[in-house]
Design a protein with these regions (language model features):
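Compositionally biased, intrinsically disordered or flexible polar/acidic segments
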Residues: 20-221
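Alpha-helical cap/lid subdomain in secreted, periplasmic
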Residues: 258-405, 412, 425-437
Length: 437
């Protein structure tokens, strides 16, 4: 028996795996696809055939299944027989009730009599596109891809262990936009002008899943103090990102709390799974979730690898970024990831090494990249998102083909300035969170 199988058989508190699963242990086939297709025309004027007209005062309700959401205040503007909706005060949100899955969203933006400038975010603030500018008299269309998920799991068979829902232990997570019944699109920027939108469920789109802790999870408010939230803008509209990371998680608790089961319930052949742990794994004061880098941490990583391979997907290990003090606080877990990647022949993105170089290059400005000693600001998340994509290009050829053709890699020794979109207020009711001076 190889070392992988031995490590898996020795796990306590996780599913016991064997090298050759019995037929009854193999994953069930996915449920039949649910089709969803919506077309919306916004503002005054005549809606084209096949489109649903949406006026500025149409608020989302579960019964209707679509509408402006989270207190959005928009204005309908008429331009002859056509129109659009816009706002100059704050971002606005449009939500559609949909089943979980991947969605292709095509928006039309612009104004025949003025300039528009739009940033698009989805769900919990994932940045899809920035600075989409149209001159007066012009419109543009842009397609983005978003993932929608729910916390429910297929219930286990009678008398079988398992759960029917992801375990959420942090206050407020259950109400987060990433878990609700809706696909939410945020329109931001100096002058967003939304003309039309088409939303199509597309089960053939591959998914990039992400697992991790609060250094990776979506923020509740703000422009995104992590790399997954800012990743989509650097990817072609041919792949969805499902960020399943959450605060407080470790490689062990991600499995025992059914988060990994949720990922596996959506995973299909051709998908990708980026796994980053270490910050909470390194806390011995958390005895129920602590992992030792040379033993249990490696074993849990091998569970992720084995289960992902069973489903025909590609796993990538991402070493944790170092904290602001730029010491060696998570170094042992980063080095353990390197060992497992080499032993199991899986791709590795060494974010830990790149982050140490980056924090050194920032010098006194390193404070601008952090919200506190451990968690990133929007600027820090932006910098690491560029390094992650650069790592994908270098080390994960199958995933690199989804990187946008216009992506510009960043050298960690030469950090870029903060992009303008980080100055924008984002999230329902959230105040502006500018980059620190």
């Amino acid at each position: 028996m190889n070392t992988t199988a031995l490590s898996l058989l020795c796990l306590v508190g996780a599913s016991v795996l064997v090298a050759q699963p019995r037929p009854e242990d193999r994953p069930l086939p996915p449920p039949p696809p649910v089709h969803a297709h919506f077309k919306f025309d916004f503002g005054p004027g005549h809606a084209p055939a096949g489109y649903t007209s949406v006026q500025a005062d149409e608020v989302y309700s579960t019964e209707k299944g679509y509408g402006f959401d989270f207190g959005s205040r928009v204005t309908g503007v008429a331009r002859g027989a056509d129109g659009f909706v816009t706002t100059n005060e704050s971002p606005f949100f449009f939500s559609v009730k949909v089943p979980e899955g991947n969605y292709r969203i095509t928006v039309t933006l612009g104004d025949v009599a003025g300039e528009s400038n739009t940033t698009i975010r989805t769900e919990s603030g994932h940045i899809m596109a920035t600075a989409l500018v149209t001159p007066p008299g012009r419109t543009i269309t842009r397609t983005v891809i978003a993932n929608v998920r729910r916390p429910e799991l297929p219930p286990p068979p009678k008398n079988a262990p398992g759960g029917s829902r992801v375990h959420m232990f942090l206050a407020g997570e259950a109400e987060a936009r990433c878990w609700d019944e809706k696909l939410t699109i945020e329109f931001n920027g100096p002058r967003p002008c939304l003309v039309a939108m088409e939303i199509v469920k597309d089960d053939a789109i591959p998914t990039l899943f992400v697992a991790g802790d609060s250094t990776v999870g979506d923020p509740r408010h703000g422009p995104g103090g992590n790399w997954p939230t800012q990743l989509c803008q650097f990817l072609a509209p041919e792949i969805a990102v499902c960020n399943s990371a959450e605060g407080g998680e470790t490689s062990k608790s991600f499995i025992t709390g059914y988060r990994f089961d949720k990922v596996l319930s959506q995973m299909k052949a051709g998908d990708f799974f980026l796994v980053q742990f270490g910050h909470n794994d390194s806390k011995p004061q958390w005895p129920q979730s602590y992992t030792e880098p040379g033993t249990s941490f490696k074993a849990y990583l091998r569970v992720f690898i084995a289960e992902t391979r069973r489903r025909g997907a590609t796993l990538v290990l991402v070493t944790p970024m170092e904290r602001r003090n730029n010491g060696d606080t998570v170094g042992p877990w980063a080095r353990a990831m390197r060992d497992v990647a080499a032993e199991e022949h899986v791709p590795l993105i060494d974010q830990w090494a790149m982050s140490k170089q980056l924090w050194t290059a920032l010098g006194p400005d390193v404070n601008r990249a952090f919200h506190d000693q451990t968690h990133l600001s929007g600027y820090g998340g932006y910098l690491l998102s560029k390094l992650i994509v650069s790592g994908i290009q270098k080390n994960v050829p199958a995933l690199a083909r989804f990187v946008s053709a216009d992506f510009q890699p960043m050298d960690p020794a030469h950090p870029e300035p903060a992009p303008a979109y980080l100055q924008q207020s984002s999230g329902p009711g959230a105040p502006p969170r500018p980059v620190r001076p």
